């Protein structure tokens, strides 16, 4: 009997649960370790903020999925992995041994971007603790957004600043501006939303046409884009040129950083802490370990840490875990040359990005809505 430990219920891991449900493996004893029975879907976060979805619409219940797959669900936070000893330790002190390990625990928000420009200075000052909200973990953000919205609507003036110009930062800014202004009405002119990101960091990797569409949408929504970097100071945000940038709340959409316990695991990792895997998503150093989603990296330049690749890699991960347990051949996951990105723009409007092609409109939002709801339904039992 092989012991299979699944860590995290991310997009790729959902495919593993589905595969185990389709073909119960009598020779595998599997357990899923995750902090919560709910897996939140990041693709629907902007729609939740904008008011199009309830929180319950945006999450997957892992309990029936695990039960259907014959997988034990153990609620807990992984905090330590000793890869050479094949041991996983949880926050409450218990440990799990494994023969086969599948990692899809996601990542953390890279708050180092906001840290003061002093060697070794942490983002731990009182102002940041009170005013900076990281996008991850998602469950925390989903819980806090209604409180943030209530504070903004109760104040005579309120400035919400999103730091980060990637797709996540843009979507959050547009969604927040739409929600706050719709709830406040025309009589409340004191709510402002801005985005802090260097010009080159606004939607990096997307075609110029997409960036132009998004720039126009931000302007039409009354969102100020400040093309500078910033760091957290004792009295607020400081721009790269030294000026104070007052904000009542800062949402950090500053990209992802590797989870520290994986960096210390003994697995082969990149310089910035991501687990290195090959095209089969097998660890380059420990063949009994597989990883997918935000926690890993590949040498393939087409591969990026995104939900798109995590979803597409899922079936390959599922096949390879079972194949490795049985001594069978592994499959490769080959990323597509271009990935489709659908960028929500606040109201029921979205921008499509695929290579150099782009489009926008209500029909793109309906397309995105259909894809997102289908993903939730496909993982519901």
Predicted regions and their residues:
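A Rossmann-like FAD-binding core segment of flavoenzymes
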Residues: 73-76, 80, 96, 180-278
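Beta1-alpha1 glycine-rich phosphate/pyrophosphate-binding loop at the start
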Residues: 1-72, 170-205
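FAD-site-proximal beta/loop scaffold in flavoenzymes
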Residues: 128-155, 237, 244-312, 319
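C-terminal auxiliary extensions adjacent to catalytic cores
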Residues: 341, 347-381
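A conserved FAD-binding loop/helix module that cradles the flavin
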Residues: 295-345
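FAD-binding core/adjacent interface of flavoenzyme oxidoreductases
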Residues: 70-159, 251
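Rossmann-like dinucleotide-binding core of oxidoreductases
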Residues: 159-205, 213, 224, 308-321, ...
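Glycine-rich, N-terminal phosphate-binding loop of Rossmann-like dinucleotide-binding domains
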Residues: 9, 105-106, 254-255
């Amino acid at each position: 009997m092989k012991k299979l430990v699944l860590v995290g219920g991310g997009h790729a891991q959902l495919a593993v649960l589905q595969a185990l449900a389709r073909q119960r493996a009598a020779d595998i004893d599997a357990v899923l370790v995750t902090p919560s029975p709910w897996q939140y879907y990041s693709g629907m976060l902007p729609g939740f903020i904008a008011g199009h979805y309830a929180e319950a619409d945006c999450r997957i219940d892992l309990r029936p999925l695990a039960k259907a797959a014959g997988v034990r669900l153990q609620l807990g936070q992984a905090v330590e992995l000793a890869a050479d000893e094949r041991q996983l330790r949880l926050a409450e002190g218990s440990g799990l041994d494994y023969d086969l390990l599948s990692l899809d625990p996601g990542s953390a928000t890279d708050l180092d971007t906001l840290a003061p420009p002093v060697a070794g200075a942490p983002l731990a000052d009182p102002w940041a603790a009170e005013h900076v909200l990281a996008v991850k973990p998602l469950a925390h953000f989903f819980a806090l957004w209604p409180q943030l919205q209530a504070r903004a609507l109760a104040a005579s003036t309120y400035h919400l600043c999103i730091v980060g110009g990637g797709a996540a930062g843009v979507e959050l800014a547009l969604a927040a501006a739409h929600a706050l202004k719709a709830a406040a009405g025309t009589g409340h002119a004191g709510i402002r939303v801005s985005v802090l990101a260097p010009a080159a960091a606004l939607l990096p990797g997307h075609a110029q046409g997409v960036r132009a569409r998004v720039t126009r949408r931000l302007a039409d929504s009354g969102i100020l884009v400040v093309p500078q970097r910033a760091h957290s100071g004792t009295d607020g945000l400081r721009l790269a040129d030294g000026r104070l940038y007052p904000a009542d709340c800062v949402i950090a959409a500053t990209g992802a950083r590797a989870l520290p316990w994986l960096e210390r695991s003994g697995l082969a990792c990149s310089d910035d802490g991501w687990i290195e895997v090959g095209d089969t998503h097998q660890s380059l150093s420990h063949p009994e370990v597989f990883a997918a989603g935000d926690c890993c990296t590949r040498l393939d330049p087409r591969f990026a840490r995104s939900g798109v690749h995590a979803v597409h890699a899922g079936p390959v991960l599922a096949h390879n875990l079972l194949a490795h347990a049985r001594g069978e051949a592994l499959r490769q996951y080959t990323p597509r040359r271009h990935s489709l990105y659908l960028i929500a723009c606040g109201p029921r409007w979205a921008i499509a990005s695929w290579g150099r092609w782009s489009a926008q409109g209500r029909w793109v939002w309906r397309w995105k809505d259909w894809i997102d709801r289908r993903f939730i339904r496909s993982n519901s039992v």
